[in-house]
A protein has these predicted regions:
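Boundary at the C-terminal end of the N-terminal hydrophobic targeting segment
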Residues: 37-39
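Active-site-adjacent pocket scaffolds in enzyme catalytic domains
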Residues: 41-61, 181-185, 189-281
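Metal-dependent polysaccharide deacetylase catalytic core of the NodB/CE4 family, i.e.
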Residues: 91-93, 110-113, 118-202, 234-235, ...
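C-terminal domain-boundary segment and adjacent tail
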Residues: 50-52, 146, 216, 266-333
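Bacterial N-terminal signal peptides
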Residues: 22-33
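Active-site beta->alpha N-cap acidic-glycine motif
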Residues: 42-148, 307-310, 316
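N-terminal secretory signal peptides that target proteins for export/translocation
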Residues: 1-18
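Alpha-helix N-cap and loop-to-helix initiation/capping positions
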Residues: 167-174, 256-260, 299, 303
Length: 333
């Protein structure tokens, strides 16, 4: 009698558990399916402005993951910039850290240019406006290696002349205008893309860039897909630039070697490709920030070369540049 009652109670509990699991699975399914719909008319969390995804089913030749490597060509100035050895930063002169920065300019930037030239792969350039004038020989040598690389405006420099945040929209417009004018003077190219110096914009920056003729920005770090921000000055395409894929933070703040970045980049893109292999999923895009301090050393270039060679073999991966992405989605600034 007691045994029968226990078995009956167990059966009842099993049925209740199965019912509960079924309800939970159904709720999860609803949340997953609702995700894209919820994001269709979302407000951007930085600006509060309307932001919507840009739907791309596939890139050219059926590729599903667009990968844009962005080399940051920057001016820091003597006594400024990233420190390889924080324990020597108080020295005057700080020979260790100044050498770290100078090597990146004179040896690292050309080495990265040679690598992409040898691999016959596109590169995009994020350029501080002061660089061509301050380092004309380096700029000319580098540009000759990647003459078709799109130039993305990256402010005046990366230390003493950043965006005038907190001084109003007009001040930012003037700064952006000056940046674009200087880049055009030094390169002959009028940039249509923007990435804020030191990754430090605010809500006004997006409207200010659009007002000055910028059509796309890398200041969005929170997505796998393209999106469009409706600024007060006009639409602005946001190209995903995930913070976890930028080399310098990992290298300096987390003590990761170039070989660690090799594994991270390969895994990141490979997993995006695995996701995108589902025909019901849309195409994705990632802009990967690289710096000559990291990938411009011999060890860094060797690691990056292995990444590029790996990505070239992946059927669904398209290594490209930002302009080609815009062209492919129908945005031709």
């Amino acid at each position: 009698m007691i045994k029968t009652e226990l078995e009956s109670e167990r059966n009842t509990n099993r049925k209740a558990l199965r019912a509960g699991i079924n309800v939970l699975v159904a709720l999860i399914g609803l949340l997953i399916s609702a995700g894209p719909a919820l994001s269709e008319n979302a407000s951007d969390w930085i600006t509060g402005l309307p932001r919507e995804p840009i739907h791309v089913q596939a890139w050219p030749k059926g590729k599903k993951v667009a990968v844009c490597f962005i080399l940051y060509v920057e001016v820091w100035g003597f006594g400024h910039g990233p420190n390889f050895r924080p324990d020597t930063a108080a020295r005057d002169p700080d020979v260790v850290d100044e050498s770290f920065r100078q090597y990146a300019i004179y040896w690292g930037i050309p080495r990265v240019g040679r690598l992409f030239n040898e691999q016959a792969l596109p590169l995009s350039i994020a350029l501080n406006a002061a660089f061509p004038e301050e380092h004309p020989d380096v700029w000319q040598q580098f540009r000759s290696l990647v003459p078709k690389a799109p130039i993305i405006a990256h402010g005046i420099n990366n230390s003493t002349e950043l965006l005038p945040l907190g001084r109003g929209l007009d001040a930012q417009k003037a700064y952006i205008q000056r940046t674009l004018d200087l880049i055009e003077k030094g390169t002959g190219v009028r940039s249509r893309g923007w990435t804020s110096p030191s990754v430090y914009p605010n809500a006004d920056t997006f409207t200010a860039t659009a007002a000055q003729g910028i059509s796309y920005s890398l200041d969005a770090m929170d997505s796998d897909v393209l999106s469009r921000l409706a600024t007060k000055s006009g639409p602005l395409v946001l190209i995903p630039y995930p913070v976890v894929a930028v080399d310098m933070g990992h290298y300096l703040e987390r003590s990761k070697d170039p070989s660690d970045m090799e594994r991270l980049w390969t895994d990141y893109v490979t997993e995006l490709a695995r996701d995108a292999a589902d025909p019901d999923r849309e195409a994705t895009v990632i802009a990967i920030g690289i710096h000559p301090f990291v990938v411009g050393t011999p060890a860094g270039a060797a690691a990056l070369r292995r990444v590029l060679e790996n990505l070239k073999k992946q059927e669904l991966v398209w290594v490209t540049d930002v302009q080609a992405v815009l062209d492919a989605m129908g945005e031709n600034p």
